[in-house]
């Protein structure tokens, strides 16, 4: 397989919004070594083998000869296809040139990615939506005195995130209810997720349990109500198939509150906590090491979380 064919193959995956620009593999490291290192990272850390009924040893046998017979950057296709067997939206790898390759997107994510538009949402408001948190939030009040907050991400890369969200809740405290929209929110940090949830708690709530690849459960953790502001009126959470990762944790916890109703479509189904692992050849494997469970103890990886309505 020559490089022209490889480039053509992956150019047809550009709709996945993933960069498939390949850098030459470091010659001193054999393709088999790169393959085996990547396989071992998953073997030692991935928490969903049993749940997904995947025999990882069989996958090794399936791709070993392919790795052995590769030349140059053909090993990238072997890694792409091997890791793609896990069907996990939290898995990708970086080439030695720093390019990210993501083998899998949830079918619901692909279906719903373009089904949401803030321009359409705006039509329901008399005034233009305000934004805050570096345009992480858009918010306003409907004519029937219902507040609306669109949370585009739970990433914690901006300090004003926390201050701005508190100010938004203060501005909406006299509304008769709030719609919290996490459609097309692809996640971020559970620290941010818990912070947002704290404003809607009457009393502490236990965080869902994380389980690692060995079946060990995370220590018990409680989310406490915000000390300064509490919004305890009715809340509707809007979700869709592109609500992913930390956004799904948000939905998972909010569904436990008596004041909350979730509406929309089943979430993407990405419940892992990923970490980066460096391997020979300059590659970085990004893969989950823990799985978040529902409150009933069930996995929601791939299956997602269904709305109430």
Language model: regions and residue ranges:
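Gly/Ser/Thr-rich loop/hinge elements
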Residues: 188-236, 242, 272-279, 285, ...
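Bacterial Sec-dependent N-terminal signal peptides
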Residues: 1-25
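Flexible, low-complexity junctional segments that flank or bridge functional domains
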Residues: 18-178, 182-198, 202-208, 216-220, ...
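Low-complexity, Gly/Ser/Thr/Pro-rich intrinsically disordered linker/tail segments
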Residues: 306-309
């Amino acid at each position: 397989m020559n490089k022209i064919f490889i480039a053509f193959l992956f150019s047809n995956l550009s709709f996945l919004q993933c960069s498939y620009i390949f850098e030459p593999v470091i010659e001193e490291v054999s393709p088999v070594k790169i393959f085996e290192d990547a396989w071992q990272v998953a073997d030692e850390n991935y928490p969903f083998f049993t749940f997904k009924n995947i025999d990882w040893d069989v996958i090794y046998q399936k791709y070993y000869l392919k790795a052995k017979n590769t030349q140059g950057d053909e090993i990238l296709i072997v890694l792409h296809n091997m890791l793609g067997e896990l069907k996990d939206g939290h898995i990708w790898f970086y080439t030695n040139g720093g390019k990210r390759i993501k083998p899998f997107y949830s079918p619901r994510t692909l279906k719903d990615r373009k089904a949401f538009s803030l321009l359409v949402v705006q039509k329901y408001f008399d005034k233009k939506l305000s934004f805050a948190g570096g345009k992480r939030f858009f918010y306003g009040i409907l004519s029937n005195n219902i507040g609306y907050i669109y949370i585009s991400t739970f990433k914690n890369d901006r300090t004003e995130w926390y201050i701005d969200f508190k100010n938004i809740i203060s501005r909406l405290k006299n509304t008769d209810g709030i719609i919290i929209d996490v459609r097309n929110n692809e996640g971020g940090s559970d620290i941010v997720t818990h912070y947002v949830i704290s404003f809607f708690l009457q009393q502490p709530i236990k965080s869902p349990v994380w389980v690692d690849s060995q079946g060990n459960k995370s220590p018990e953790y409680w989310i406490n109500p915000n000390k300064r502001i509490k919004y305890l009126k009715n809340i509707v959470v809007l979700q869709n198939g592109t609500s992913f990762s930390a956004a799904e944790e948000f939905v998972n916890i909010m569904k436990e509150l008596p004041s909350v109703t979730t509406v929309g479509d089943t979430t993407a189904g990405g419940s892992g906590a990923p970490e980066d692992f460096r391997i020979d050849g300059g590659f970085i494997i990004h893969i989950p090491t823990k799985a978040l469970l529902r409150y009933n103890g069930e996995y929601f990886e791939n299956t997602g979380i269904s709305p109430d309505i």
